Amino acid sequence: MPVEVIPVLHNVSSVQRVVDMARLSYSLGLDTLVVTKAYGGAAQSGVPEAMRLALKLGKSLVVLPELRDAVNLLSPTHVLAVTPSRAERLVGPGGLEGLEGRVLVVFSGGEPELDPSEAAGAIRVYIEGVEGKVGPIAEAALILYFLLRGGGDGRG
């Protein structure tokens, strides 16, 4: 079964972070980006700018109030939560073994990691060979690239 990777940017207030995540996701060939719990500038300016980019490229942007809404509505086979300090598995150039179906990859849009309650039930992952938090866009670039190139075509 092929893997469909869908990035999720959760709990974000930065306009630039939303736009950068959209550019990154779409440039990797992904069709869908999900933004959950956007507030402040991200909600007022970042989401509209990312929507403009999505429409221009023929891609999708899904904006939802909570992470659980994305999980409930998109019915993923797996949820990966990017958590540098509590990772159970590491994602490297070979991707991540055992993934199939629809995979949501959740990146924290703010400085704190995902709250343990938000990551409940998810596979907690981080980047092989990287020590410490490098920020959500760098994390997304590496993890999404490894997942897409390491284990078949994961374009969503």
Curated annotation (Swiss-Prot):
It comes from the Archaea. Coiled coil: none annotated. Keywords: DNA-binding, Endonuclease, Hydrolase, Nuclease, Restriction system. GO terms for molecular function: DNA binding; endonuclease activity. It catalyses: Endonucleolytic cleavage of DNA to give specific double-stranded fragments with terminal 5'-phosphates. A putative type II restriction enzyme, its methylase would be APE_2002. This is Putative type II restriction enzyme ApeKORF2002P. It comes from Aeropyrum pernix (strain ATCC 700893 / DSM 11879 / JCM 9820 / NBRC 100138 / K1).
